[in-house]
Amino acid sequence: MSWINKIENAIKELEGGRFQNLGDAYLRKKYHFQNLVSLGSQEGTDKTTKGIPDSYAEENGKYIYIMYGTHKSVLPKLREDIRLVKEKIYKDNIKEAKIGRIICCHTSSNIEIKQKEELEELAKPYKLELIGVNEIANDLTKLEFQFLSKEYLSISESTEQIWNIDDFIKIHDSSKTNAPISNDYIGDISDIVSWITS
């Protein structure tokens, strides 16, 4: 079985709360969300809680509403999620100009073009982004996401010898025997520049 198939199958087997936690970590990494808030998951667990949206973030001064679904009958769930988010936006009296988009992450790979267009129409006047199991699994095979497949799915094809800079610093600094390298430099930066250029 190929690595991507293993990841897809593992994602489909996740319970709702675990999928939500994976999704939050994935979206945080994919879109560099610094302030993602998980309303739909219980702190410190893989359990879900009631809340609309499941998570939200802010990007360029606009709110991103995020919903997750692990249901086998994905279309009714997506329709319901979109309806609930729109109701919540209306109820909370959030202006349309403050809404960036609605993201729906799901575990299906069977949404046809016509169905996608129907969901986009249903989401109007807001932009809809659908992220399915194929896209998530494909991204989890990329170097910058591989730590997520290991942490949330216990799948690792990497020898863990190559990391992006942020992950390397995080891993390096987490060791009790290493001196941290994430410290800010205090001093005259021109000294460093002159050393490098000389």
Model-derived features: where do they sit?
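Mixed-charge (Asp/Glu-Lys/Arg
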Residues: 1-198
